[in-house]
């Protein structure tokens, strides 16, 4: 499947993500246990990463940069897949990982320094994507990253992908986009890039 002519992006959207949604539903209804869910999720993440490395090398690299941060264990798989998809369509994509258990009084400064070091001087669009199903880390990350808006040469966008329970709260956080759907987030990210090209042409 990985070496077929099927779009690698479509493999992730049409096969991997629906499978994970089904597994989540089965777990919530008690049809599978925690270890079975973990095994399937880990296998799906392995597939996503393999898709990244067998993806076409002919994709044009865009002047578009994204750092993806997970704020909860449950959102990690979506964050990893988002990173792979953006890589496959030509973005410079960085996946920081999950920070759910890393927060301390100085960690906000640590994240700000990292993002500034990696992305503040690049030319083009920069998008920071926050994936979190945890109210505390979602608030922490959005507040931490919003303070960087004035430190970037180019355009900086902040997007949040969360669950239905936290969607309303995320919409009140003064970020550029909020959603519960990975497909919607990717489409919004593409549209922001197209708009940035038009604005700078």
Feature map (PLM): residue ranges:
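Short, well-ordered coil/turn elements that cap or connect secondary structure elements
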Residues: 88, 123, 153-155, 172-173
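Long amphipathic alpha-helical segments
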Residues: 1-55
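Generic structural signal for well-ordered alpha-helices
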Residues: 142-146
